[in-house]
Amino acid sequence: MALIPAVTRLTSSVIRILGCNPSAMTLQGTNTYLLGSGSRRILIDTGDEDVPQYIAHLGDVLQQEKASIDTILLTHWHHDHVGGVKSIVGTKLAEKDCRVFKFGRTDAPDVCPEIPTDIKLHPLAHNQEFTTEGANVRVVHTPGHTTDHVVLAMNEGTLFSGDCILGEGTAVFEDLFEYMKSLEKILDIKPQRIFPGHGNVIEEPIGKIEYYINHRNQREQQILQFFVQRPNENLQAMDVVKVVYKETPENLWPAAAYNVNHHLSKLEKEGKLRVSKSADEEFYVYQPTSAL
């Protein structure tokens, strides 16, 4: 993985502060972004909870900038994006009236265990705008990675992509059907560069987004063909993996099956497969177009 410094000024109005929480899932760590050029700034995401090194770096930046945080925008509910809220709100890093915003979840109660209940979460809305001196961002709801995921479109073609698009590798998702629609939505924005939630800046984002879309579409066609060739069989994800992912080491098959299940769910939503239940187990069966 490429090295990412703890603090990087990306533009005159964007400073990236690394969350100092590296792992297999977070890559170099969570990227958080300080927006604006005046004394009151917007912070996108807050890293993990209880990471003193991150809070120290954030504090140093704010001191150098002679600024504080008055708005926190959370791209989604995962702990490595919301965990730092409690170490910022109510401290010298933030204005007394600092507000925290997050889009509501639709799959579960909209509660973040890492955020104390006395810190109010204000709802985000699709196309809502936030402005501070030197920066303006627009909220774009992009479900798929999670139901509450948003990206933030900034002036001059900059997009903050959260975990929808990563600086390295491909993203994970809860709902592939929604995720693919969100990728198309981002493609329509035509970003000129992407500041991701993990990994380095993406300077040629259109190619990256198209790669994400094409990669998933190609895999989906392989999976669908597997069913077409077995039109009357009740099949599960691992049946697909053993054939479509036969070149993949067997110890990685469970992870492959996780992805395949997302594809199967998407194909079922599109009417290309149907669900068959037998002995409390779910199977998928090919659904010919003529049967629709």
Swiss-Prot record:
Q: Which SUPFAM superfamilies match?
A: Metallo-hydrolase/oxidoreductase
- Name the Enzyme Commission number(s) assigned to this protein: 3.-.-.-
The UniProt keywords, alphabetically, are: Hydrolase, Metal-binding, Zinc
Q: Which residues bind Zn(2+) 1?
A: H76, H78, H145, D163
Q: Tell me the Gene Ontology biological-process terms attached to this UniProt entry.
A: RNA 3'-end processing
Q: Which domain of life is it from?
A: Eukaryota
| One Pfam family in the UniProt entry | BLACT_WH
List the GO molecular function terms. Answer: metal ion binding; RNA endonuclease activity; single-stranded RNA binding
Indicate which residues the UniProt annotation says bind Zn(2+) 2: D80, H81, D163, H198
**What cellular component terms from Gene Ontology apply here?**
mitochondrial matrix
Instruction: Give the main EC class.
Output: hydrolase
The record's listing under CDD domains reads: LACTB2-like_MBL-fold (cd07722)
Carries keyword Hydrolase? yes
Q: Which InterPro entries match?
A: LACTB2-like_MBL-fold (IPR047921), LACTB2_WH (IPR041516), Metallo-B-lactamas (IPR001279), RibonucZ/Hydroxyglut_hydro (IPR036866), Sec-metab_biosynth-thioest (IPR050662), WH-like_DNA-bd_sf (IPR036388)
Gene3D superfamilies to which the protein is assigned, alphabetical: Ribonuclease Z/Hydroxyacylglutathione hydrolase-like (3.60.15.10), Winged helix-like DNA-binding domain superfamily/Winged helix DNA-binding domain (1.10.10.10)
Stated family:
Belongs to the metallo-beta-lactamase superfamily. Glyoxalase II family.
**Any idea what this protein is called?**
Beta-lactamase-like protein 2 homolog
Q: Which organism is it from?
A: Drosophila melanogaster (Fruit fly)
